[in-house]
A protein has these predicted regions:
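Long, hydrophobic alpha-helical segments that serve as membrane-spanning/inserting helices
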Residues: 1-15, 36-255
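Hydrophobic membrane-insertion alpha-helices, especially the h-region
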Residues: 20-33
């Protein structure tokens, strides 16, 4: 009678299982590294895209600052002339005509608005965490601080203009102003025979005092505009160098 023997498979050594584990671990780890590298690449591309967009915003901002600065300088010149002429008492007919003209040249609000599309994304969508370069992040925050400061000074300047309107409406007849079609220069001239509504020296003195306040705030506004422009140009340069981007070089304030 034949006896059948069961075949015995050779047991695998523990080193075999160790190598299987190592190979599996390496496969998972390499996959993790590849995915991590991919995420870093995507974030780096997003960072660079943000910087390109911010660069374009900064170019627009510097143009805006230069434009508003020129207008503020012109208006300040009219304000100073208005103060000097208004302190002459009593005003002659020729002086009244000049005061009307200068009043018409100093009423426009010197508003400014910065491009905030990219900045809003950086602030609200967690974009700042993508900015790996500390020098860039610091320069961006400093620029934002300058913008906020400019807005505060702008609002105070607007308030000064509103307080002037309360008094000027009791001094000047609007009918003597010759209107223009240019929104940037709404008064083109003054009609002959211009008179004050109330030729009251105390009222005129109050008006001139408020004009002086606006002139002071305009000077502060000019200084803030210059600081803002320096900050914008500094940020432009830092971004261009850090990310090897090109942009039109901004010129200093044209005075």
């Amino acid at each position: 009678m034949e006896v059948h023997h069961h075949a015995h498979t050779e047991r695998k050594k523990w080193t075999h299982y160790l190598w299987e584990f190592i190979m599996l671990f390496l496969a998972v780890f390499c996959g993790f590294l590849a995915e991590n590298q991919r995420e870093h690449y995507i974030e780096h591309q997003r960072e660079k895209q943000y910087m390109r967009s911010l660069l374009e915003d900064l170019q627009t901002d510097t143009t805006t600052i230069n434009r508003v600065h020129r207008r503020a300088l012109t208006q300040l010149s009219f304000l100073d002339s208005l103060i000097e002429l208004g302190n002459h008492s009593p005003a002659k007919a020729d002086d009244i005509h000049k005061l009307y003209f200068l009043q018409g040249k100093t009423t426009r609000f010197l508003n400014i608005r910065f491009e905030d599309g990219t900045s809003s994304q950086l602030k609200n969508a967690g974009g700042m965490r993508l900015i790996r370069k500390e020098e860039v992040a610091k320069a961006i925050r400093e620029y934002w601080d300058h913008i906020e400061s400019l807005y505060r000074v702008r609002d105070r300047l607007e308030l000064a203009g509103e307080t002037i309107a309360d008094v000027s409406s009791r001094i000047f007849y609007t009918g003597y102003f010759i209107k223009s079609d240019d929104p940037l220069d709404p008064v083109s001239g003054i009609k002959t025979g211009a008179k004050f509504i109330y030729d009251d020296q105390r009222l005129i003195a109050e008006y001139i005092n408020r004009i002086a306040t606006k002139a002071t705030r305009t000077r502060i506004y000019l200084a803030e505009l210059e600081d803002g422009l320096r900050s914008a140009n500094n940020l432009l340069q830092i971004i261009k160098e850090a990310y090897h981007l090109s942009a039109d070089r901004r010129t200093p304030l044209e005075k």
